[in-house]
């Protein structure tokens, strides 16, 4: 889903090299089973992909999902219908107590949280966001159906922003930003000083280029500044890529004095990429260096690995052990294993997984 699926057809026939870095002695990433279990819900939001989180100032974090299963969980078979019910959803989750959760959907049919208009051939997939004052802003991509199957859609535009009233969590409006030369700016938003730094990607034919822009935290609609070889400029044409990689999963966060870039190995089907990588930089615009393989998937089923994507960092969920929470999405096992049996499936094949990565595994200075 999100950009990983949108660019998947372009990337499908291309191969890439793995780049492994030795793990510092005594440091290891582990599957956070407790946090993974928070997503094993049986009512409301039950399963989905996406997994961007927006830390709010009321002790909660807004989790944002794409195609999602809402209800219809059978406790006897522990299964859900094979087809999801909504195109997007929200989940309000406590930061200190993640078991406190509230599903957020809308009143349309289907009851997606974000919707605009009545034509169900169009829908939103949410990306990153942030809060300012009593409003959360979420960056959205708008899609249109153009056929059946996993990739039966096309992106219409990526410049929509939803405004959400806090603490009511009601959507109070949508706006559309000026075009950004085909760059999808919704991979990450990082606050630093008076600015929000926003990251976006654009296909280069063999992967994606990563870009960064910034705008005042207090005013999303002020003139954006774009980073290029000459520094920051309000001229969009001055924008230059800050990183390139054979993937569509990019996420950035800040830990202490380092900017952390999280990417994934290329995967659009079963038994493809299995690795999650980290890079570090002293500046929001890179260069991102010090590549580490911080996790290799362990989600095998009948000897096969799933289609996986969207490794996102959630620094607000600090466990006090200098470990970064990262979630990643899996989307069943494709042609390798038939997981839809008599119209139902195990929701765990479409639920996010959580890992904890030691800061010093990412960078020994952290």
Give the predicted meaning of each segment.
Residues 1-4:
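Positively charged n-region of N-terminal signal peptides that target proteins for export
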Residues 12-15:
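C-terminal motif of bacterial Sec signal peptides marking the signal peptidase cleavage site
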Residues 19-44, 56-122, 131-180, 200-245, ...:
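Beta-rich carbohydrate-recognition and catalytic domains
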Residues 52, 264, 305-329:
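C-terminal structured interaction module
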Residues 181-188, 195-198:
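Extended, non-transmembrane interaction/recognition domains
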């Amino acid at each position: 889903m999100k950009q990983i699926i949108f660019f998947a057809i372009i990337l499908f026939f291309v191969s890439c090299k793995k780049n492994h870095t030795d793990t510092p002695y005594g440091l290891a990433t582990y599957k956070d089973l407790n946090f993974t279990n928070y997503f094993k819900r049986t009512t409301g939001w039950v399963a989905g992909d996406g997994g961007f989180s927006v830390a709010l100032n009321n002790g909660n974090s807004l989790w944002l999902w794409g195609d999602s299963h809402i209800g219809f969980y059978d406790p006897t078979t522990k299964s859900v219908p094979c087809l999801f019910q909504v195109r997007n959803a929200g989940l309000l989750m406590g930061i200190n107590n993640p078991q406190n959760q509230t599903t957020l959907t809308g009143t349309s049919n289907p009851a997606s949280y974000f919707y605009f208009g009545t034509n169900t051939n169009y829908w939103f997939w949410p990306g990153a966001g942030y809060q300012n004052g009593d409003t959360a802003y979420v960056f959205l991509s708008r899609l249109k159906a153009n056929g059946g199957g996993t990739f039966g859609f096309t992106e219409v535009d990526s410049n929509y922003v939803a405004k959400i009233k806090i603490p009511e969590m009601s959507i109070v409006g949508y706006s559309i930003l000026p075009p950004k030369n085909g760059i999808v700016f919704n991979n990450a938003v990082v606050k630093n000083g008076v600015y929000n730094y926003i990251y976006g990607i654009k296909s280069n034919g063999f992967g994606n280029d990563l870009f960064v822009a910034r705008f005042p935290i207090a005013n999303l609609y002020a003139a954006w500044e774009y980073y290029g070889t000459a520094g920051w400029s309000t001229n969009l044409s001055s924008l230059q890529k800050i990183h390139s990689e054979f993937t569509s999963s990019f996420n950035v966060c800040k830990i202490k004095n380092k900017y952390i870039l999280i990417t994934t190995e290329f995967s659009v089907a079963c038994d493809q990429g299995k690795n999650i990588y980290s890079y570090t930089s002293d500046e929001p615009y890179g260069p991102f260096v010090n590549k580490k393989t911080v996790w290799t998937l362990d989600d095998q089923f009948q000897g096969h690995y799933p289609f996986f994507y969207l490794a996102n960092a959630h620094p607000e969920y600090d466990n006090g052990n200098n470990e970064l929470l990262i979630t990643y999405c899996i989307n069943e096992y494709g042609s390798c294993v038939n997981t839809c049996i008599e119209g139902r499936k195990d929701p765990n094949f479409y639920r996010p997984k959580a890992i904890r990565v030691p800061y010093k595994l990412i960078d020994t200075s952290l």
